[in-house]
Amino acid sequence: MGKKDKKNNTLAQNRKAYHDYFIEETFEAGIALVGTEVKSIRGGKANLKDSYASIRNGEVFVCNMHVSPYEQGNIFNRDPLRERKLLLHKSQINTLLGYTAQQGYTLIPLSLYLKNGRVKVALGVAKGKKNYDKRDAIAAKAAKRDIDRQMKERMRY
């Protein structure tokens, strides 16, 4: 038996986070879920848009993460927007607490993915972008796309 192919196990992404924030550092965290939520997330029914994480009483919770109810879940389904606990080591929580104590920093979930059969969250320490930063990023992306297009044309001949 060979090893399984390394494939993309990303279940949900927060694309808006990279547009609205500068991501300073990322952390990997486990997430406490019930069975029907895991099935729903594996089915691609999770939405990280407008979600954030907060630290309370030495624990980290992700808020506003929408997980649609599992279709065959019946009474076992939970509230789609409930707060879910993130599983981190105490030293990691203290590091995050140090970051968020600074003015302008927040915790944003960047993606949900599978690792060894477990759902993990990529948690980013983020600082908000101003409107001119967003415009600069869009202009740089457009310039790069034009350069790549021209290079492709030149390489054909």
Curated annotation (Swiss-Prot):
Swiss-Prot/TrEMBL keywords: Cytoplasm, RNA-binding
Any one biological process term the GO annotation gives: trans-translation
Function summary: Required for rescue of stalled ribosomes mediated by trans-translation. Binds to transfer-messenger RNA (tmRNA), required for stable association of tmRNA with ribosomes. tmRNA and SmpB together mimic tRNA shape, replacing the anticodon stem-loop with SmpB. tmRNA is encoded by the ssrA gene; the 2 termini fold to resemble tRNA(Ala) and it encodes a 'tag peptide', a short internal open reading frame. During trans-translation Ala-aminoacylated tmRNA acts like a tRNA, entering the A-site of stalled ribosomes, displacing the stalled mRNA.
Stretches assigned to coiled coil: none
Subcellular location field: Cytoplasm
Family matches, as NCBIfam families: PRK05422.1, smpB
Name of protein: SsrA-binding protein
Organism in which the protein naturally occurs: Clostridium novyi (strain NT)
Pfam families linked to this entry: SmpB
Family classification: Belongs to the SmpB family.
InterPro entries with a match to the protein in the record: SmpB, SsrA-bd_prot, SsrA-bd_prot_CS
Gene Ontology CC terms: cytosol
GO molecular function: RNA binding
CDD domains linked to this entry: SmpB (cd09294)
